[in-house]
């Protein structure tokens, strides 16, 4: 009898680090989660249930913000402004916030995942305030040590090819 092959185990995600659609780093980071890298998975908790980080992303563009306390009103306003990004081909583009924290936080209207083992923060070289812009295919587009909606909007425009000459 023929053996079945799990083809999913034979594939390796591509690093798209050379793509002009990525936004180069302006802040210092360590590790593999560079713009263009496929996201690393890690165990998390969502609504008190064990889960995996990658199951929480991939529903569109997302901004993953690391926080140890509820975000300030300014940061919440920046996250809200990201929900209504400039349209692409006359279609609205939303950026969905995802908050990663080491302890439970209640932030109305936003998904909060608890990094119970600290592995998400470690793998993403994150500290409170670090933010990542993620593609729908679970690749890193850009990352910063602090969230800035203007930088995030510029990175999204670049990812959508809405800027002049990409270099």
Describe the predicted segments one by one.
Residues 1-167:
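Helical substrate-recognition/capping region of FAD-dependent monooxygenase/halogenase enzymes
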